[in-house]
Amino acid sequence: MKKSISLLLLSLLMITPSCQKTKEAANEYNIVPKPNQILPQEGRFELNNKVCLVVPSDAPEVKSIAASLAEQLKLTAGISLKEAESADGKTAISFVVQEGMPKEGYKLSVTPSLITLTASQPNGFFYGVQTLYQLLPPAIYGKQLDKKADWSVPAVEIEDSPRFVHRGLMLDVCRHYVPIDYIYKFIDLLAMNKMNVFHWHLTDDQGWRIEIKKYPKLTEIGSKREKTLVDYYYVNYPQIFDGKEHGGYYTQEQIKDVVAYAASKYINVVPEIEMPGHALAALAAYPELSCDSTQTYKVSPTWGVFEQVFCPSETTFKFFEGVMDEVIELFPSEYIHIGGDECPKTAWKNSAFCQQLIRQLGLKDDTTPSKIDGIKHSKEDKLQSYFVTRMEKYLNSKGKNIIGWDEILEGGLAPNATVMSWRGVEGGMNAAKAGHNAIMTPNPYVYLDYYQEEPEIAPTTIGGYNTLKKTYSYNPVPDDADELAKKHIIGIQGNIWREYMQTSERTDYQAFPRA
């Protein structure tokens, strides 16, 4: 595959304005995402066995990054970089620590005799190396020696730093389980394009994918379904299933290894444990967590929104506290994503327990619109806010903060919650204007399960239509946003919902190059 295509992955992030010359240069050099500044120079730096590698002796993490570069050049180019204390009078690749630069920023200077990579923090050096890789032949990403490639780097001056602190991609592994090998590949792709958050969607109606030792039935029962929808999902459309059991989950040891691997590439793994909706996989394992434990629940073989949700009972809260205790030990991330989306209130309206709890808590239907979103919310909406706030308090007590989909705005927002805005941009803007951090991930701009070509010629998807141009044109901070909103919109994220992505290859097809 041509370099210009292979590097056009995961580039909806780090959007930065630049002059026309910079734009043309970025196109010429195929650097993704486009750097803040790129200035072409004359000549090329030739990589060979005479090149020295210079790294500060008192920066062990930077030395590790430089060593990885040297190892990859040895593997793919057959070039052995010689270590040196100084670049003076030598043809060298030099890593220079410079205080005061942006935390994740870097400068890359290439002349015919010297490559200088300057940053203040290890992740800045890591991102600079990713840019250097993109200036090299595509063979640099391989695992075999390629003596035919042109192992040289064009002379150039590059300066870059990210616009957002959260630059993420969500992978849904519930609707279709993803083999562990692909998880590592996925992380590699994020790292290659300087993304720093892997949002791991681990629980849903269609499967529970994380081992919880206190509750073994979650994976014994909740990780499996008897069949899977394979044709279009429409209410009045005949549903066709494959008739095959589908399942899989990740052990805690596997998760620890993934988290460590991601950390080595400066990627934070944020787990998502859905509540109070999208509960069927858990209810199939533990029906006492529902509002009607006499029912039989099954892991869903199809998509959609289901009325069977978690009951806001002490049993449920004790369950989630036990789950979160184990999740916290696996994920060092500051954030835990608690879902909060698409929670129908029918079961709560019909539950004597829930209605009694509503009265006990003094919850009432709104008589005036909410100051946050301008909508009158029901007492059941406020019960969801109680659910979310209670879990937030527990996680806060463990040193964690929560992220939730924008429905957590309904009925009142938990004090320290970050909102992930998926139903358009309004949720994120409302949260930001109210002083809460927001991550923009709006449907349809960054929903990668949508069609990207004419449906008549494309594989089956969930629907929608989202072109490459539409995705790339999205600006997460509207031009008319006030200063408070600008301050609190902390990032952007693409979402890969895998309703019809049965294989890793299909996932790649849907995700790229839009992601």
Feature names for model-found ranges:
Residues 62, 179, 208-210, 279-281, ...:
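Extracytoplasmic/secreted cell-surface and envelope-processing proteins
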Residues 174, 203-207, 274-278, 341-345, ...:
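Active-site beta-loop-alpha junctions enriched in small/polar residues
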